[in-house]
């Protein structure tokens, strides 16, 4: 069930991995609207969902990383 989805835990792991690699703030997420939106909700910076993952969108970012089926980044 979606009520059992571990969104908070995924956000904590994502933020930790991000902080190990970058000093910037996560301000965008890409991927499936439900999964990426859930991640956005649980991240402190509340990044904006900008649609499905596309290479050209990622190339415009200063920093980015992809975990499973979601990418997060910083402009």
Question: What spans do the regions from the language model cover?
Answer:
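Luminal/periplasmic acceptor-recognition loop/helix of membrane-associated glycosyltransferases
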Residues: 2-75
């Amino acid at each position: 069930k979606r009520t059992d989805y571990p969104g908070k835990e995924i956000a904590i792991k994502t933020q930790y991995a991000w902080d190990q690699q970058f000093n910037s703030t996560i301000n965008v997420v890409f991927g499936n609207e439900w999964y990426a939106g859930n991640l956005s909700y649980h991240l402190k910076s509340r990044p904006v969902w900008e649609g499905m993952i596309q290479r050209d969108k990622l190339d415009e970012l200063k920093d980015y990383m992809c975990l499973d089926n979601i990418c997060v980044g910083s402009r």
